[in-house]
Amino acid sequence: MSENDSSESDIEMDPEEEKVYRRQVEESDGFDVDYFRYAGIKPCPLKDENAYTYDIELFGRLGLHCYNLLHEGTNLKLMCIPKYNTNNIGVSSGDYYYITLEAIDTYNNSPCTFQTYVSEWYQTSEHGYLVVETYIARLKGPTGPHNTCIGRGWIWGWEEEAIDVYYKGKLPKWLTKDLLAAAKDEYYVVQESDILENEWLHLYAEIALYSNWKWHATRKSCEESPHLKLKANNAIFYMGFKGSGDHHPSGKHVEYQTIVRKAMDGKPGHIRLEVDSWQAIPSDLIGEDEPP
């Protein structure tokens, strides 16, 4: 391969630039880094704090959702995203984002600056399979020397052993009426009041719809009441919904079916969503046929 065929990632940085770059990464965990042409982490220029794309908004909201789950008595909501960085680490099937956002705690009307480190990667499947993971979900702290550099995978990496095997591997098939009837004690049917009270259910549906656009049952426990399954750390959601901006040639709204598997390993800032989503026929809702 000639020099002209080399990619930027194959070209070494100037030693002095690399020294500054590494210091910035270590002191900010990758969130506050200047532009260096041959660096892995690069800032993405935004015209203003509202010029971010829809996927970045979704991932920022997922980071807030993760934080709210782990910090009782908080309800952080997104206000704007002033900056984010991308990480080119040579993984062709995935993207990594360091997102800095402004949020407000609706419980006490207190504003804050928030940081979340998120990855999205996808696999080939019959419909479209997306995995979104957070590694950091935190209030922004002071920048400076510390011992929690994101480059140390043992700090931010996932504890896979902490996740039950039921919530790993291939996603389950769509929940048919027969399966639901045979194991009704294992599942909780989400009520309309649940949807109104838990905005994160809308977030899961939006991420599922995003995965569909881009890539054209909770486990039984005798100690757990059905309603508590909705907020379990590890859960599987079977969702049917309509895209408000999508219309079938017949004039009807397009309906979607989605399986979302949520997993948490107990470490701060960690939540994983595995999403499989597909377009359904108008009568194809939960309790009916499997996906085509």
UniProtKB/Swiss-Prot annotation:
Question: Which residues fall in a compositionally biased region of kind Acidic residues?
Answer: 1-17
Region Disordered: list its residue ranges.
1-24
Q: Which domain of life is it from?
A: Eukaryota
Family membership: Belongs to the UPF0725 (EMB2204) family.
Which protein is depicted?
Answer: UPF0725 protein At4g28920
